[in-house]
UniProtKB/Swiss-Prot annotation:
Compartments in which it is found: Plastid, Chloroplast
Predominant place of localization: plastid
PANTHER family: MATURASE K
Species whose genome carries this gene: Arabis hirsuta
Function description: Usually encoded in the trnK tRNA gene intron. Probably assists in splicing its own and other chloroplast group II introns.
Family the UniProt entry places it in: Belongs to the intron maturase 2 family. MatK subfamily.
Keywords: Chloroplast, mRNA processing, Plastid, RNA-binding, tRNA processing
The keyword NADP appears for this protein: no
GO molecular function: RNA binding
Matching Pfam families: Intron_maturas2, MatK_N
Signal peptide: none
Protein name (database record): Maturase K
Gene Ontology annotations of biological process type: mRNA processing; RNA splicing; tRNA processing
Gene Ontology, cellular component aspect: chloroplast
Amino acid sequence: MEKFQGYLEFDGARQQSFLYPLFFREYIYVLAYDHGLNRLNQNRSIFLENADYDKKYSSLIVKRIILRMYEQNRLIIPTTDLHKNPFLGHTNLLYYQMISVLFAVIVEIPFSLRLGSSFEGKQLKKSYNLQSIHSIFPFLEDKLSHFNYVLDVLIPYPIHLEVLVQTLRYRVNDASSLHFFRFCLYEYCNWTNFDIKKKFILNPRFLLFLYNSHICEYESIFFFLRKRSSHLRSTAYEVFFERILFYGKIQNFLKVFVKNFPAMLGLFKDPFLHYVRYHGKSILATKDTPLLMNKWKFYFVNLWQCYFSVWFQSQKVNINQLSKDNLEFLGYLSSLRLNPLVVRSQMLENSFLIDNIRIKLDSKIPIYSIIGSLAKDKFCNVLGHPISKATWTDSSDSDILNRFVRICRNISHYYSGSSKKKNLYRINYILRLCCVKTLARKHKSTVRAFLKRLGSGLLEEFLTGEDQVLSLIFPRSYYASKRLYRVRIWYLDILYLNDLVNHE
């Protein structure tokens, strides 16, 4: 962003309408292309590549785009002309692709400047471990044990394009840029009936910006409702000795409390409400009653239907009781498990037993969903029986082995925090046997003959880092294997979901 600020120096009078003129500057396209290419190289595993834009970028195309933007009628191609000359559609789609890249970079400028100004004078703490997805689970293990219900919400996408434009309208005060954005977006999406649209996709950075702006608007309204919905906790009711005119006493007590003890007013807000958003979904965990959870469900449905004009079915908001239902969260099936614990207490000559119940977060592996993903990618059938990977038989033995080892270790590292490892061992078994069958098929041999010729050392590559470390810590005994089966290890180097974990 510092590179852009070197080219963009604005006075106070032009800050409200400085975006639109940037579309007609050639150096902005160069900076946008260079910035986007560097971001793709740094985050190649997270963002998609826009190969068409990278290959077809040139200064000549930029000059043609600028000339056409001076006369927007030249960017409009009737459908009859598309049937006669499909090349016109390909050319204009390429123009809209480059404009989308530029629009994403330009509109991010005021957001970045506003964000940078808010951090001035503040010293931010860097916690690299919190960047991992697995940093969420230790937090939930500490918090979810105090909750009763979880609201599982599937965030809907806006159906009409005008919803996206109106959302940006609250953030961007440049009317000309919004009108141009609306024009390009509608022209691009009007060609849904033509095959040329399937070969071109908008820039992922642009789509990510639209999605985040849409979610930001939704969450700002939700947080406003969250602050307005604070209510008195049940532990504060002990100060009232009588139940006559109960709510009147609450109001009078609050007036006295605010006047005399303003610093302790936070005690009367309900802190047991946590919101987590992930992968197009969000969960709202709370200690409320079923009546209040139904109210929150009603709020979500009406918020999307009335404010965002999106048809949102009530079935997309599920109320899960953690003690009975499983919560699908980040590839795990999470629930609360009651562990009875008996403690013997000795007091002088008398001894007695105390029954305690510990509530613990139980994270299970969705074995059926993962087997379905493996079957979809031809690693096994729908019943979980391993089959050979026919499309990999043209590769070398080392490449085949490295592919299977990499997939096996990724899954093992991600699901290493599960409460029971039985399903994880089953997945590893499927991948190991699939690897052996693939190599045996390549060498035109049977599995038994192939293993007899190479020995069991071939499968030692599948040992994960967890197995290697724990085998050095614990001695080889029945008790050690049982402890290894129960232990949880969260790997903090996992920053995103891989394809097999993302099985929805």
